[in-house]
Amino acid sequence: MQFSKMHGLGNDFVVVDAVTQNIYFPTEVIKRLADRNRGIGFDQLLVVEPPYDPDLDFHYRIFNADGSEVSQCGNGARCFARFVVLKGLTNKKEIAVSTAKGKMMLCVKDDDMVCVNMGEPIWEPNKIPFNANKFEKNYIIRTDIQTLLCGVVSMGNPHCVTQVEDIQHANIEILGPLLESHERFPERVNAGFMQIINRNHIKLRVYERGAGETQACGSGACAAVAVGIMQGVLGSCVQVDLPGGRLMIEWQGKGHPLYMTGEATHIYDGVIRL
């Protein structure tokens, strides 16, 4: 199998062309490839497939290191876009893709930056999915060690965002797993911890479902900004500083798509026997 190793702000991926290669990924194979000591090592595996819809360019699949398939990864989307251009799978700079839960537009810029139209944030609890009677800007979520005030949203995958005073001392190692597997999230959740610097600048750490804390989470950055805007504490254009680097997020509010812009870096190409 031919593959590329890429990263988006330190969130690392193996990207595979399943357009020209006939490849199937059982859970056991994904886990073996994800092993950083015995395999390649990655946070997520990204698979480029032929489009299911003739009006689209590709189908985008994402697998976590534990073998579970998810429907969205913002950092991965940027790497996906750069990959298909680098490998000559398309000569377009604006690329339309489908995912397990919808469609995305990816725009590859000349400076190696990629802008992703992430679509509209989803707030209805049953669509996230999240166990709640109605939408609220803040939900009280009780864990074994702490009661938290959280915003909950889907960016194609579920996110729970809570504000913290100091991102460096947030109890993410304990709270992250408790939120990820909380009973109110039937499909588990990505847990974001946000420190607000000002209305246009936040710091963020994300504990991703199936992967643990990562260097950066693009959909998590989008979710944090969307929650902050809905709660009235952030402006429409926000710089998000993650452990792995910086993203710019823009959202004009309900009825509008949310845009994420950031780097996508190609590290190396390789071949491995499955």
Swiss-Prot record:
The gene is dapF. It comes from Histophilus somni (strain 2336). One of its GO terms (molecular function) is diaminopimelate epimerase activity. The active site is at residues 73, 217. The record marks 159, 208 as: Could be important to modulate the pK values of the two catalytic cysteine residues. The lineage of its organism: Bacteria, Pseudomonadati, Pseudomonadota, Gammaproteobacteria, Pasteurellales. Catalyzes the stereoinversion of LL-2,6-diaminopimelate (L,L-DAP) to meso-diaminopimelate (meso-DAP), a precursor of L-lysine and an essential component of the bacterial peptidoglycan. GO terms for cellular component: cytosol. Substrate binds at residues 11, 44, 64, 74-75, 157, 190, 208-209, 218-219. This is Diaminopimelate epimerase. Disulfide bonds: none annotated.
